[in-house]
Amino acid sequence: MKLIKNIILGTFALTGSLAVTSCSGLLDTENLYEANLDSYYSNKTEIDLAMSGVYNSMFVDGVLSEEHLIASLFSDLLLAGGGPDDTNSQNLDAFLSNTEDIHVDLWKETYNGVYCANAVIEAIPNADFTADFTSEDDIEDYMNSSLGEAYFMRAFYMFRAAKIFGGMPLIPTTDADREVARATIPETYQFIATDLLKAIEYLPEENINSISLNDYGHANIWVAKSFLARVYMYYTGYMTNIEKIATDELPYDEGSVTKSDVIAHLEDVINNSGHGLVSDFRNLWPYSYVNESNSIYNPDYVAGDAILPWAADNNLAWVGQDGIHSTLGTGNNEVIFALRFGLGNWDYDGGTGQKYSNRMPLYMGVRDHSMIPFGQGWGWCSVHPTFYNGWSDTDTRKAGSVLTLGDADQGTGSWVAGKSNQETTLMNKKYTTLQHNGDDGVLGMFYYIYNMNNADPMQLWAAQDFYYMRYADVLLMHSELTETADGLNKVRERAGLEATAYSLEAIKTERMYEFAFEGVRWFDLVRWGDVETSNNYYSSPITVSNAGVEASYSVTYRAETKGLSAIPQSEIRLSNGIYSQNPGW
């Protein structure tokens, strides 16, 4: 019996048309910055529609504009992989670019999102909510919550872009001059920090157990506090270790955020949010559900059969991806903020609807193979074998993060070498294609879970959320800032490891293993300055297979880039000389 008929993604659901058209008149039109806001967003219905537009810019069209994929290719833990035609990803992995606009969609969606957030921030004080609520208190609560979300998302977009491009043009209002120079890095982060503090001021302090399923995925105060810590640590680290301007403060409009301020915010998350660690790290990832899904949807299922024996042997059970009240699994209290993906459709959003499905499993899936339960992908981002070989087998995260090819216990016994470049027999298990048999044949697990109906499912069926922030990060950030081992050892205990004394090196090692392939490692290396030291896997020669031909390869970093990528050349031309290209590009 089919238990799940559709996917719930909150009010910005992508299975319908709301999010795709949600900034109508504002997104992707010639009048993007010229709409008359006096006639827009005057009541709750219109504000909710506008808020969908704010979140919609989390999705970008070009896959090499995905923050987490850029970070994966820049990371020392992953190789480019792929096939002979995947030159753009292979050049990025080598810190080269032969495409002048490789990240242009990230730049565009940053300012689409900023504009929509500006529109909400400006409209709310003038909107009339008397027909929508029965009391002034309810109106005030709604206004504050909506303002808090808009301020957070504006900060989120600017931070996402600043980590890739550095200083960004600041557009604080809908009618602000857009022909402005890029702000400095301190000015950009001052803008981000100010917005995060406003979000914290406006958002209600609500335990996650009281957040409804329909509201899951929206920003809340715990999201804002957690991201304030991440922004603080990235900014102070970048300025100190890359720019060589030592600082332990994050500027905002009325002063500076200090380390003690950030620690207090993290302790509020730890003590009051309701977030926690799920009991088994491996249950965070959808492969922990593939046996159960197969038992539900496969008409030929025989009781006791497991298509992923390793998961059955370890009694894995997915916690789901819809928060504490997840529609599947036991409930996920660890994920604090996620990019909520649905089932893509080529017809959405002017033919760019693939972006509404998670392309990481597609691009990082095993190339040119269709196995059960690990299906076909493009073979990007093979795992660095030196990193893997140095990882203790007693750490449950090792087998929980890395897919070993040619291993029957892992469901990859039929794998044949020589299908992709930079093969290492090791792939990302957290984000990979999952499939099994069902009424419609061997198709994606999410195809069956969410009752997909699409003519091109293989490229569109990865409805797996991308985790931007987990509670484990809160614990490890707190340990790093306080220089104490409590949070560190809670994370280690879950992984089956013994307690250890605090040291920065212990934190670095733990973060490397805990967040492998989650788009975190690269930014950690940058903020610690470890991109410029030997404390990484760059320039470590390894043997790989390129379509069956053995070769030597080493992951590359170029220090002259200062940890940044190239801004789109088209934006430099459009600026008429106001913008200049980043160093090293």
Predicted regions and their residues:
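Flexible, polar/acidic helix-loop-strand segments at domain edges
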Residues: V383-M469
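Bacterial Sec-dependent N-terminal signal peptides
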Residues: L3, G16-T45, I192, A229, ...
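Bacterial N-terminal signal peptides that target proteins for export
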Residues: K2-G10
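Short coil/linker segments at helix-helix boundaries
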Residues: A131-E140, G167-P186, Y238-A264
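Extracellular structured ligand-interaction cores
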Residues: S145, F152, G167, A219-S226, ...
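An aromatic- and glycine-enriched ligand-binding surface/loop that stacks and positions planar moieties
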Residues: S24-T87, H218, W222-K225, R230-Q422
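Long, intrinsically disordered, low-complexity segments
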Residues: S22-L26, T110-G113, I185, A193, ...
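Conserved, well-structured interaction surfaces
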Residues: K44, D48-G62, G83-F165, A176-Q190, ...
